[in-house]
Regions:
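N-terminal phosphate-binding caps/lids of nucleotide- and nucleic-acid-binding domains
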Residues: 1-198
Length: 198
């Protein structure tokens, strides 16, 4: 309701809880190594239980492979959408995290095929290029503004590139993706007299 409320948003949820919930109903492989650690760790989990654990040599960062979602709770399978829809939702979630953290390299594979990889160079424009594609990234304009209580920074499209829907809008508050009708309406209002009609 105010700029103070925006400043108070810290995390918008704890992702670790979601990871534990996913691991409880799937088969998961995790490989991870901190920057200053000489070795990494590999875990194989099945239904939330650790089946294998070992020290390994691996690159810095974390890789998670999730397979056989709901293998141990078949009743839940009937509530899942088609594979394509579930894959699209997972892809969108990775896109949002990649855009909010350009300093981290993300790689998204579906059925063994790489669909996206960000460089992790800390530059938002590089992440935009990897996530949205060359054509879209090159058409965007940087924008930045600040007031007494808040600042806004990002990229906007030229009015000639506007879509008829909100699918290309991505809003982040303190590094977290948010869906906000208020922000979307404000963006539409700002563009109202700029859109090309026809």
């Amino acid at each position: 309701r105010s700029a103070y409320d925006l400043a108070a948003i810290g995390t918008l949820g704890f992702r670790g809880e979601a990871l534990a919930a996913i691991a409880a109903v799937s088969r998961v492989e995790v490989m991870t190594r901190q920057a200053d650690a000489p070795f990494g760790a590999a875990l194989v989990l099945e239904g939330g239980a650790v089946r294998e654990r070992e020290e390994i040599g691996c690159p810095e960062g974390t890789t998670m492979i999730v397979r056989d979602l709901f293998f141990n709770t078949p009743a839940r399978l009937k509530f899942m959408k088609r594979d394509a829809a579930e894959g699209a939702a997972a892809y969108a979630a990775v896109q949002h995290v990649a855009l909010s953290h350009p300093e981290i390299s993300f790689r998204f594979l579906r059925d063994g095929r790489e669909e996206m990889m960000t460089p992790g160079d800390g530059k938002l424009h590089s992440a935009l290029y990897a996530v949205l594609g060359r054509e879209v990234a090159l058409s965007l304009l940087p924008c930045k503004g600040s007031g007494e209580e808040l600042s806004v920074e990002g990229y906007i499209s030229r009015p000639s590139c506007c879509r008829g829907n909100r699918s290309g809008q991505h809003f982040f508050v303190n590094g977290r993706y948010v869906k906000s009708r208020t922000m979307a309406a404000a963006m539409e209002e700002a563009y109202r007299n700029q859109k090309m009609v026809g």
